[in-house]
Amino acid sequence: MTQFLNSNSKTNTRFKGFNWANSLKDVYIIGAGGTGSWISLFLSKIGHTIHNWDRDSFSFENLSGQFTLTSTLGINKARATRANTRAFGCNNMYHTYDVHWDESQFAYKNANIVISCADSMDIRKRAFEYWKKYQLAKTNRDASEMNIFIDTRMSAVTGEIYMLTTSKHMKMYEATLFSDEEAIEAPCNLKATTHCAATLAGLVVAMFNNQVSNKLDGFYIQEVPYKTTMNLNTMQIITSDSND
């Protein structure tokens, strides 16, 4: 594990008036590829502490969809993403783990906020089960505590975001999980685009900020949908909540 800290961050100058910009969290991000790398950048700009897992290294093909630079090709994705956020002016605390995530990686951690950007349904399911078990086992819950599980799924021009903030969301989300064998593999030259990954990541961070703001205000006026579907071919973004 490696980390980086510089407490003199000035990356929030233009938005520090928002309440969410001054409520920094520990965020656990599984994956540093398509959406994971962009989400890590956007959350680092705010100043959150990032915990980022990925065993793979950036390759030339990743330049077409992921937040990486030619100078970090061949470097582990988690460590490279941290380095790339530094190149873009971020100096938040950023922990990296150059291994595939498994349950032991969350041991003894306050894993309240988990964002799954894994390319494996198996890891998505296991990460969710760990997060759910951790949440349900709590006996003394802090009213100001943030409890969020986010799952991102993406193709070259479409994307889905599942944002779980209630026990009802947990039950609904379980029905969306399937095995890796059931997943449909897209052709190599139709798998990912930079603008789709960055747009999806932007929506994730916007909803994350809304949830933080609602929690701080004590009332829920900003939208935090359970499911968001994005299609760049039809230019549609459709949201639905557990009550729809």
Question: PLM features: residue spans?
Answer:
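Short His-Asn-centered micro-motif
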Residues: 30-31, 53, 97, 116-119, ...
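Glycine-rich phosphate/ribose-binding loops and adjacent secondary-structure elements
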Residues: 18-20, 68
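Glycine-rich phosphate/adenylate-binding loop
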Residues: 2-5, 21-24, 109-244
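S-adenosyl-L-methionine
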Residues: 1-15
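Conserved SAM/SAH-binding loop
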Residues: 97-105
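A short helix-to-beta-strand connector/capping loop
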Residues: 89-95, 145
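Glycine-rich phosphate-binding loop and adjoining beta1-alpha1-beta2 segment
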Residues: 52-90
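Glycine-rich adenosine-cofactor-binding loop
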Residues: 25-47, 51-59
